[in-house]
């Protein structure tokens, strides 16, 4: 494959003077949004070519420099299942730990949790789903059985004073079951919250959701779980990620997952774009007058760095618009 020409980020003209649009007809938007950067874990885990440990460490350090307050760093899963995450201990120990920044890691089981804690993890994440078929095909058990597995992690985490974040996959649709009942999403979310997850991220795993579906799902979940404990994780498969995120913001959600450069494809839709690009999210939020604490220019540099390392173009529209290829 021919080497890509190096992309040179241009300085964003007038970013600091972006005027907040009128939000009178949009409902009350949060004044501040916490962005959970998932690129180093969710974005890289399905890359076919192994990304070197130094590159992963530099990416995370650059994201820290950009001001992201939460950076999901790696996954303590067996290298047999996810070879890309085989260097999890080296990555977690090798990154600079910036004051005020959290570096959670994914721990699918108790063994992974114990390894993560031994490596210095202060926060972990667990993955559930609102679809029985997805759960069966993904981790070979029922939703109820998955809760039993999570219970061991949550009890160990409580004893070790480790915070646990929960994920609910297929919140807006499933590759196997199709439509998912909002009541089912609410049920699974409520269970994770009652078990001790301080925050639950509701994921549109295959990116089929629309703002209308997002509104219906969140309305059901918000009846069971405090709004402050909810986050959204949108995929852009059908170009709906920003629209769905905006709907969630209008409903009061103030925590959003995203991935630098839009890293992370949708494994169930061949060739489809994956995670919401952090650059695009930050640009939208800044334009709405919502504080993020993120330096967009430094974020663009981090995205450019990892795209060069992967020899691919960015999926971020903002990065595409502000770079000379």
Curated annotation (Swiss-Prot):
Binding site for substrate: 41
Location (main, coarse): mitochondrion
Lineage top rank: taxon: Eukaryota
Localization: Mitochondrion matrix; Peroxisome
Modified residues (N6-acetyllysine): 48, 111, 137, 179, 324
Sequence ranges assigned to domain Pyruvate carboxyltransferase in this UniProt record: 33-300
EC category: lyase
Keywords from the UniProt entry: Acetylation, Disulfide bond, Lipid metabolism, Lyase, Metal-binding, Mitochondrion, Peroxisome, Transit peptide
Pfam families reported in the protein's UniProt record: HMGL-like
Reactions this protein catalyses: (3S)-3-hydroxy-3-methylglutaryl-CoA = acetoacetate + acetyl-CoA
GO molecular function: hydroxymethylglutaryl-CoA lyase activity; metal ion binding
Recorded GO CC terms: mitochondrial matrix; peroxisome
Residue numbers carrying N6-succinyllysine: 48, 137, 179
Function: Mitochondrial 3-hydroxy-3-methylglutaryl-CoA lyase that catalyzes a cation-dependent cleavage of (S)-3-hydroxy-3-methylglutaryl-CoA into acetyl-CoA and acetoacetate, a key step in ketogenesis. Terminal step in leucine catabolism. Ketone bodies (beta-hydroxybutyrate, acetoacetate and acetone) are essential as an alternative source of energy to glucose, as lipid precursors and as regulators of metabolism.
Listed PANTHER family: HYDROXYMETHYLGLUTARYL-COA LYASE, HYDROXYMETHYLGLUTARYL-COA LYASE, MITOCHONDRIAL
Quaternary structure and partners: Homodimer; disulfide-linked. Can also form homotetramers.
Protein name: Hydroxymethylglutaryl-CoA lyase, mitochondrial
Taxonomic path: Eukaryota, Metazoa, Chordata, Craniata, Vertebrata
């Amino acid at each position: 494959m021919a080497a890509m020409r190096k992309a040179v980020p241009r300085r964003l003209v007038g970013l600091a003077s972006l005027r907040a649009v009128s939000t009178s007809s949009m409902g009350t938007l949060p004044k501040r949004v916490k962005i959970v950067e998932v690129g180093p874990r969710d974005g890289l885990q399905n890359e076919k070519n192994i990304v070197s440990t130094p590159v992963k460490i530099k990416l995370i350090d650059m994201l820290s420099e950009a001001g992201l307050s939460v950076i999901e760093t790696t996954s303590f899963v067996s290298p047999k299942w996810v070879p890309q995450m085989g260097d999890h201990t080296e990555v977690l120990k090798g990154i600079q730990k910036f004051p005020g920044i959290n570096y959670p890691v994914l721990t699918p089981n108790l063994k992974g949790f114990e390894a993560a804690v031994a490596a210095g993890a202060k926060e972990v994440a667990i993955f559930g789903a609102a679809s029985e078929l997805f759960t069966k095909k993904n981790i070979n058990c029922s939703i109820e059985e998955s809760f039993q597995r999570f219970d061991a992690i949550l009890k160990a985490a409580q004893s070790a004073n480790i915070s646990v974040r929960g994920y609910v996959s297929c919140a807006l649709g499933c590759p196997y079951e199709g439509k998912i009942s909002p009541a089912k999403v609410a049920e699974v979310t409520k269970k994770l919250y009652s078990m001790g997850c301080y925050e639950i991220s509701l994921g549109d795993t295959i990116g089929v959701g629309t703002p209308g579906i997002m509104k219906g799902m969140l309305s059901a979940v918000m009846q069971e779980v405090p709004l402050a404990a909810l986050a959204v994780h949108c995929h852009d498969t059908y170009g709906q990620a920003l629209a769905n995120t905006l709907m969630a913001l209008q409903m009061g959600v103030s925590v959003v997952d995203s991935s630098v450069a839009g890293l992370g494809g949708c494994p169930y839709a061949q060739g489809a774009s994956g995670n919401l690009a952090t650059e695009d999210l930050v640009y939208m939020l800044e334009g709405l007058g919502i504080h993020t604490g993120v330096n967009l220019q430094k974020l663009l540099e981090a995205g450019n760095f990892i795209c060069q390392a992967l020899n691919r173009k960015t999926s971020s529209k903002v990065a595409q618009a502000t770079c000379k290829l």
